[in-house]
Regions:
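Viral structural modules
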Residues: 1-142
């Protein structure tokens, strides 16, 4: 959806991996972004997000909020072009991960892994504006 000439923010959802109960915590981060242009569903987009730690804040006793910055450019083939004519769309925004700890955290490290990217659409659809990425993220808290 366009809002005054701007594309909406990405939806970023970190999900804690089953069995990840101590630091380093492993998350799967789902990133969903509406693209500026329709893209060919059959051609995989390129996107490698870079995660960086921004801050940690105390929200209650033994409860903290870690703010992480995500940045990367989605490179994709628009439906009205050819493979030699790609488009790029930047994602640069923050998201938060809640943390419970009896000890006050003194350091936080984030590290991203190799994502799986796709353009998703309805069956038999050739083009879509919905980009989805699943990216692993390791969060070390000391």
């Amino acid at each position: 959806m366009f809002i005054m000439g701007k594309i909406t923010s990405a939806i970023i959802t970190p999900v804690l991996a089953a069995g990840s109960t101590t630091s380093p915590y492993l998350f799967q981060v789902n990133i969903t972004q509406r693209l500026c242009h329709s893209s060919c569903i059959g051609l995989q987009p390129s996107f490698f997000p870079i995660f960086s730690f921004k801050e940690i804040s105390k929200v209650a006793d033994n409860q903290y909020m870690v703010r992480v910055h995500l940045e990367g450019t989605i490179v994709y083939v628009p439906c009205d072009g050819n493979e030699c004519c790609t488009k790029g769309q930047l994602i640069s925004q923050d998201f938060s991960i809640p943390v419970a700890s009896v000890n006050t955290p003194t350091s936080v490290t984030v590290e991203g892994g190799t994502p799986v990217n796709a353009i998703v659409g309805q069956p038999c659809q050739k083009c879509s504006r919905t980009f989805v990425s699943e990216a692993p993220l390791s969060l070390t808290i000391a």
